[in-house]
A protein has these predicted regions:
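Structured, non-membrane catalytic/scaffold regions adjacent to prosthetic-group chemistry
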Residues: 2-202
Length: 202
């Protein structure tokens, strides 16, 4: 028997082209995390680009906060089936980070690594060409810790578990290495428009 709510109902025509299959729209911003929210001290915060264990470039908070900023308005989609439209973010584009660091990606893949030990894998192509940023502000204010502040990865065209909270490094990998949820049955890519939620989804 269908449950009350979105299941079994078509989305309104005005949002149908923005709402991936199996999703429902929310005006809230649900908080879903692996564990307790880590306390990240800005005085000791550091973000790095790494090739395996070798650092290629790194920034303190003061240095990172002085980098060129970009604003984005994007829809976001969680694997738990909620979508939120027109979210406003500000941060440093991955393209700009690579350019400022003077590097070309040495591999085709990387792992985003977080201060709480979380990791998730991404193809480089999904981070460049204006598709992703390290976000430090949301809705005109500093990014709250519960939503990944002081800085999180934002990859809005993939399910939101790929937008790692409390990010501390992007580590280039020689192959597509599974991260935390990918090792536990989540899809290696996570395209919401193809409903790539779990291993075995097309």
């Amino acid at each position: 028997m269908p449950t009350r709510g979105f299941i079994g109902r078509r989305p309104p025509a005005e949002v149908a082209d923005r709402l991936p299959p199996g999703q429902h729209r929310t005006d809230d911003f649900p908080v879903l995390s692996l564990g307790p929210t880590p306390s990240v001290n800005l005085d000791t915060w550091k973000f790095a680009l790494m090739n395996g264990p070798r650092p290629l470039a790194s920034w303190t908070w003061a240095e990172f906060d002085a980098l060129p900023r970009t604003s984005l308005r994007k829809d976001i989609h969680c694997v738990t089936k909620w979508s939120k439209f027109d979210t406003d973010w500000e941060g440093v584009m991955i393209d700009d980070l690579f350019s400022i660091a003077g590097i070309a990606p040495p591999t085709d893949y990387l792992l985003a690594q977080s201060y709480d030990g979380y990791e998730t894998n991404l193809p480089i192509v999904d981070l460049i060409g204006g598709r992703a940023m390290i976000a430090t502000r949301y809705a005109g204010a500093p990014l709250e810790a519960e939503h990944g502040g002081p800085a999180r990865l934002l990859v809005p065209h993939l399910y939101f578990w790929k937008s790692a909270k409390w990010v501390k490094a992007l580590r280039f990998t020689a192959r597509d290495e599974a991260g935390f949820w990918e090792l536990r049955g989540y899809h290696m890519y996570g395209d919401p428009w193809r409903e790539q939620r779990y291993t075995g989804d097309p």
